[in-house]
From Swiss-Prot:
It comes from Blastomyces gilchristii (strain SLH14081). This is Long chronological lifespan protein 2. It comes from the Eukaryota. The keyword Signal applies. Belongs to the LCL2 family. Keywords: Signal. The gene is LCL2. InterPro entries: LCL2. CDD domains: LCL2-like. The keyword Signal applies. Probable component of the endoplasmic reticulum-associated degradation (ERAD) pathway. One of its GO terms (biological process) is ERAD pathway.
Length: 121
C-alpha cells in the first residue's frame, strides 16, 4: 500500500515539475514578464510623420536622397541605405540601384546586374 502511495506521489511530483518547466519555456520563448515590457518600448508602431518632419527640415541645396536623407549633387550619387550589405551600381541612364551583396564573390553582383539589363538573366 505504501508503495502505491509513494509511486503516485512521485508521479504527481514529476508531472508538476514537467508542467512548470514547460511554462517557464513558453514564458522565456514568448517574452513573458519584464522582458516583454522592455521590448515594447523599442517596437513602436510605424509613423511616417517622423520621416516627413526630418525630410522637410533637412537643409540641402542640391538633391536630398529620399532613402538616406543624404545631400548629393545628382540623384544617382545617393548612397545605399545599408552599405555594409549592399553594393551600389550606377546605370548608364543617370540612375542607380542598390543590390544585396548576397555572399557573391567580388564582381559577381555587378555581372548579374549587367546580364539582367541585357535581358539575359
Amino acid at each position: 500500500m505504501i508503495h502505491i502511495i509513494t509511486g503516485t506521489l512521485l508521479g504527481l511530483l514529476f508531472l508538476a515539475t514537467g508542467a512548470r518547466a514547460q511554462f517557464q519555456f513558453f514564458e522565456q520563448m514568448f517574452g513573458g514578464g519584464q522582458q516583454q515590457q522592455e521590448s515594447q518600448e523599442h517596437n513602436v508602431p510605424s509613423d511616417s510623420s517622423w520621416y516627413q518632419r526630418t525630410y522637410d527640415n533637412a537643409r540641402c541645396s542640391d538633391y536630398l536622397c529620399p532613402g538616406t536623407l543624404a545631400c548629393v549633387s545628382v540623384p544617382h550619387h545617393c548612397p545605399c541605405q545599408h552599405p555594409g550589405v549592399e553594393d551600389k551600381f550606377e546605370l548608364g541612364d543617370g540612375s542607380a540601384i542598390c543590390v544585396s551583396k548576397g555572399g557573391f564573390k567580388p564582381g559577381e553582383a555587378a555581372r548579374k546586374v549587367e546580364l539582367a539589363r541585357k535581358g539575359l538573366l
